[in-house]
Amino acid sequence: MSAKRSLKLDSVKKYNPVEASPLAKKKDLNSYSPTTGTCQISPFSSPTSHNAEDLRNGLSHGDETNSESRLSRRGQPQTAEDAFAELQSNVKSSLVRILKARENLTSLQALEGSRELENIIGVSDSSHILSAEVQKTQALMSQAEELQLLKRNHGQLPAREYAQPASSSAFLQLLLNSL
């Protein structure tokens, strides 16, 4: 007992994680490695700031700059045709979501019983019309591309060499000969 009194072990407060402040709790959790579950030996052994993790994981989370997203794979700037094709692809992919939203609005309209929602979304049975419009737009775009090709060839049909060959080796030969 005399040793206990000289070291004053009775007055030492034991650590209770429930009584810890939120900052101390966070600091206590941050000292453990998320992969191994072990405590860090040194606070300088690995980056604990969120900025370092963001820099490491930035591309995996899809954080790209606008300049990178506007460049094609080979680093070339995006042409107007490429931009339009991308927009057309986005319209095509969002068609299903648009139709679902329109369906939800028409069900709201039936519950509401007023004509205001019909004025917002247009004709109530136009879901098939919207998909038909997308198909018409694609057909018109292919016709416009054919017309541009005709203009480039001064009103003549495209030459036989521009037709797609049957085999890949013939296609590669055609490419090599055109250079």
Curated annotation (Swiss-Prot):
Keywords, alphabetical: Activator, Cell cycle, Cell division, Centromere, Chromosome, Kinetochore, Mitosis, Nucleus, Repressor, Transcription, Transcription regulation
Keyword presence, Cell cycle: yes
Pfam families named in the record: CENP-R
Chain ranges for the short sequence motif LXXLL motif as given in the UniProt record: 172-176
InterPro entries reported in the protein's UniProt record: CENP-R
Compositional bias per record (Basic and acidic residues), positions renumbered to this chain: 51-64
Annotated GO biological process: cell division; CENP-A containing chromatin assembly; regulation of DNA-templated transcription
Cellular compartment(s): Nucleus; Chromosome, Centromere; Chromosome, Centromere, Kinetochore
One of the record's GO cellular component terms: kinetochore
Segments for region (Disordered): 1-79
Biased composition (Polar residues): 30-50
Keyword Cell cycle annotated: yes
Role of this protein: Transcription coregulator that can have both coactivator and corepressor functions. Involved in the coactivation of nuclear receptors for retinoid X (RXRs) and thyroid hormone (TRs) in a ligand-dependent fashion. Probable component of a centromeric complex involved in assembly of kinetochore proteins, mitotic progression and chromosome segregation.
Domain comment as written in the entry: Contains one Leu-Xaa-Xaa-Leu-Leu (LXXLL) motif, a motif known to be important for the association with nuclear receptors.
Protein name: Centromere protein R
Organism, as annotated: Gallus gallus
Lineage: Eukaryota, Metazoa, Chordata, Craniata, Vertebrata
